[in-house]
Amino acid sequence: MDRYRIIEVKQSVFADNDAAAERLRGELDAQGTYLINLMSSPGSGKTTTLLRLLPLLQRQLRVGVMEADIDSDVDADTISRTGAKVIQLHTGGMCHLDAGMTREGLQQLEAAGLDLVILENVGNLVCPAEFDTGAHLNLMILSVPEGHDKPLKYPLIFQTCGAMIVNKIDVLPYFDFDLDQVTAFARRRNPDLEIFPISAKTGAGVEALADWLCTRIRTHKEKKKETNA
């Protein structure tokens, strides 16, 4: 009996969150704000990638960033130097954000008027993938030192993401990491997954990623305008 109750509660939590996420997406569409949920392991280079990516995105878009961590404001302080609007979210021990937490963060950020908000989720390959934040795009980073077998071990995050960044390609010669193999493993989980090999350290590949994101955001907004016309 106890075990059945736990499963039922968990299902209810996910269902409630999914409904809240759909409402949030609709509200963001109405105000013209596109939300990206950025997920990865700790140390994969999320913040360094954003430092490279933001100046390119800011050429075309008004961008805000929400930095989620269990504690500390180091990342928010770093990102603020790019000139992007940024807030720090402390999760109080939670290993992920859900739609309700994301909504609260967007209100604090005053996201209305921004073209794009990037949520840098808590560093974790498991929990963040389980909760819909209301984002239009789930984007993940896998770094070369983590190994090319991660799609086999952590399938859900690869299944829920629309694109994967393979970061730290500048250290490929020093690690047993096969780019073709990780591509095959990842697309076994998600055949439509877009893959971008980059080096946040050198900047290699980042411009192609920025161009793809800008095109995707523009296309999404144009489709919404046509639907609402």
Segments predicted by a language model, with ranges:
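ATP-dependent carboxylate-amine ligase
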Residues: 156-160, 217-224, 228-229
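Iron-sulfur (Fe-S) cluster-binding modules
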Residues: 1-16, 23, 201, 205, ...
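Conserved C-terminal guanine-recognition region of P-loop GTPase G domains, centered on the G4
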Residues: 128-135, 142-192
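ATP-binding Walker
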Residues: 41-44, 204
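Nucleotide-state-sensitive switch-loop elements of NTP-binding domains
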Residues: 3-26, 31-36, 44, 48, ...
